[in-house]
């Protein structure tokens, strides 16, 4: 490698590090100037202020539940995609992993429509809000389980399982799973669980829209951050932001540490085969794929249908009618928001600029 390449490589690392670290250092300096350097006090402030009470417990509880449900839903999908051959498999994989690349507000609006008065009509029951949030997180993160687990399942040499069937510890599916599959895939499952937990732990839009009265650390910070770092004005908000940031930093650091360990364990230590030889036909897998596809596309379909339902206000009441007025307003714009063409152009400019 030439000296110029080394220089530009080092320069890129320095610029990236500066862009990442310097804003954080400035923010921390301003917040600590107001709150003082007391990490224990920052964390204690979360339960001492009414705005942030119970946020720590709720954040951990919903993240753990979301992770468990995501694995329960996602692993069977990864199994049938990895072990069996399917027509239009790339299309199926794209559909099943689509939620992860969609804005989280899409998931929120989709599930609110499903649970609303024109769906299952359970939104008025506040006890369903928590479950709606957990299912929305699972919908959003099942792509992680598929992406982490499917490559392992789709490339393992089938001779291993055939040989294990001849041994006493491989007579049943459970014994084969225990002695062959689980040791091979548990690093991938754990890695997917770590990432799912982090995304659920730091969730904002889904929590803000679905569980209106409950808040995570992320949504609490967003609520009070406008007054943080200002001396003499709502100084407790600086404590809340610092405490929540510290907890999130420790969670993220722990997850990255676990991921680095699991990444080493996920390195290929067995003989791999081509997917063409590993995967077989199994029509029973459709009993997994069809419900999974329905689960993935249902929120999207509900949003599309909802975009054609418009509230019509009359003198004494309001009703919903089917109309394209919503699309017309989106395309033409108004004083409150730009037209669709301008918003799309801005998105493309920002995305290509960031990519460059």
Give a label for each model feature.
Residues 1, 38-48, 178, 322-335:
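A short amphipathic helical element positioned immediately N-terminal to and/or at the very start
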Residues 4-36, 49-154, 184-211, 242-260, ...:
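Membrane-water interface segments at the C-terminal ends of transmembrane alpha-helices
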Residues 35-38, 148-162, 171-173, 201, ...:
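Transmembrane helix boundary and interhelical loop/hinge segments in multi-pass membrane proteins
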Residues 84, 156-185:
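Short helix-to-coil transition segments within interhelical loops
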Residues 85, 120, 157-163, 264-275:
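Cytoplasmic membrane-interface regions of multi-pass membrane proteins
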Residues 203-234, 315-320:
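Glycine-rich helix-loop "coupling/hinge" segments at transmembrane-helix boundaries
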Residues 225-250:
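Helix-loop-helix hairpin linking two adjacent transmembrane segments in secondary transporters
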Residues 258-288:
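Alpha-helical transmembrane segments of integral membrane proteins
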């Amino acid at each position: 490698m030439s000296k110029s390449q080394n220089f530009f490589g080092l320069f890129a690392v320095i610029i990236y590090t500066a862009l990442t670290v310097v804003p954080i250092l400035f923010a921390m300096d301003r917040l600590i100037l107001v709150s003082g350097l007391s990490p224990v006090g920052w964390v204690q402030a979360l339960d001492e202020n009414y705005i942030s009470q119970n946020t720590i417990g709720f954040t951990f509880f919903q993240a753990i539940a979301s992770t468990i449900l995501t694995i329960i839903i996602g692993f069977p999908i990864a199994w049938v995609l990895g072990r069996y051959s399917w027509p239009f498999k790339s299309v199926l994989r794209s559909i099943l992993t689509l939620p992860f690349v969609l804005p989280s507000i899409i998931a929120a609006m989709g599930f609110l429509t499903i649970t609303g008065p024109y769906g299952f009509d359970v939104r008025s029951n506040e006890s369903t809000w928590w479950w709606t949030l957990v299912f929305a997180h699972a919908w959003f993160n099942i792509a992680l389980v598929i992406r982490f687990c499917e490559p392992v399942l789709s490339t393992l040499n089938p001779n291993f399982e055939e040989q294990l069937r001849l041994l006493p510890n491989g007579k049943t599916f459970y014994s084969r799973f225990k002695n062959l599959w689980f040791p091979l895939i548990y690093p991938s499952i754990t890695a997917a669980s770590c990432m799912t937990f982090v995304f659920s732990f730091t969730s904002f839009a889904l929590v803000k829209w679905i569980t209106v009265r409950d808040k995570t650390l992320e949504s609490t910070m967003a609520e009070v951050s406008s007054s943080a770092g200002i001396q003499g004005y709502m100084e407790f908000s600086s404590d809340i932001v610092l405490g929540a940031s510290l907890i999130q930093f420790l969670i993220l650091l722990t997850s990255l540490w676990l991921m680095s360990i699991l990444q080493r364990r996920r390195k290929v230590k067995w003989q791999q085969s081509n997917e063409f030889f590993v995967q077989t036909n199994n029509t029973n897998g459709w009993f997994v794929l069809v419900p999974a596809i329905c689960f993935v596309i249902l929120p999207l379909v509900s949003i599309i249908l909802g975009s054609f339902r418009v509230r019509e206000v009359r003198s004494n009441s309001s009703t919903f009618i089917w109309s394209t007025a919503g699309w017309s307003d989106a395309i033409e714009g108004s004083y409150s928001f730009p037209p669709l063409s301008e918003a799309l152009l801005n998105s493309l400019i920002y995305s290509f600029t960031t990519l460059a």
